């Protein structure tokens, strides 16, 4: 089951172990959903609203629809490929800056009742969006991308006389490249990200994409 992916985000402190003085204990919940393509998803989500607000900011990368449209226009203008993908369990790629404890519930099977320390950016924690953003921003910089000034969640780099772009919406990516497959393979092989639904853009951020008979890319934002 997919919820087992989150179990590696905890440090087991043993049954009945007390949390340090001044720390709160929270619960986590298993949330089940069905994706637009029929895939089933289970996610372990923490009661982060019960924790204190982090001293640094909370942030998630959320490209605007306007920025996405401009990026797609540039792709068509320069005859570049337009791909999209979803990074599986993205938050769990980053470590959390918060120190949060929880008491394991029945979903943890034989560890029910144990005290667990969360050390990964679990969904629901206040700082998880920022930690994932920082993690993936480091990845893009390492590959040679820089954030654009007017749309910081669109990243760009010059390659062979053309500009390539990556639009980030939390863990959903749209990218415009001469060779999109190579970029996806770098994310998988070098950085070990788990990509899902990778390929020519057809559905992204609630929008359907298709090409007319003359090859024109059309965007229908009826679900945005």
Describe each region flagged by the PLM:
Residues 1-224:
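Long, low-complexity, charge-biased intrinsically disordered regions
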């Amino acid at each position: 089951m997919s919820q087992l992916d989150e179990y590696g985000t905890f440090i087991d402190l043993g049954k009945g172990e007390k949390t340090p003085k001044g720390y709160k204990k929270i619960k986590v919940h298993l949330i089940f959903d069905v994706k637009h393509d029929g895939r089933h998803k289970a996610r372990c989500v923490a009661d982060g609203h019960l924790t204190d607000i982090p001293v640094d900011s909370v942030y998630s990368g959320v490209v605007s629809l306007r920025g996405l449209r401009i990026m797609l226009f540039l792709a068509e203008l320069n005859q570049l490929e337009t791909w999209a993908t979803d990074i599986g369990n993205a938050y769990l790629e980053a470590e959390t800056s918060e120190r949060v404890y929880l008491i394991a519930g029945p979903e943890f099977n034989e560890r029910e009742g144990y005290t667990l320390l969360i050390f990964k950016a679990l969904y629901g924690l206040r700082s998880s969006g920022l930690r994932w953003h920082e993690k993936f921003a480091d990845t893009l910089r390492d590959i040679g991308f820089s954030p654009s000034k007017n749309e910081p969640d669109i990243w760009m780099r010059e390659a062979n006389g053309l500009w390539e772009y990556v639009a980030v919406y939390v863990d959903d990516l749209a990218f415009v490249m001469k060779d999109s497959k190579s970029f996806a393979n770098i994310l998988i092989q070098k950085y070990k990200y788990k990509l899902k639904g990778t390929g020519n853009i057809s559905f992204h951020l609630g929008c359907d994409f298709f090409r007319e008979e003359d090859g024109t890319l059309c965007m229908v934002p009826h679900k945005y």
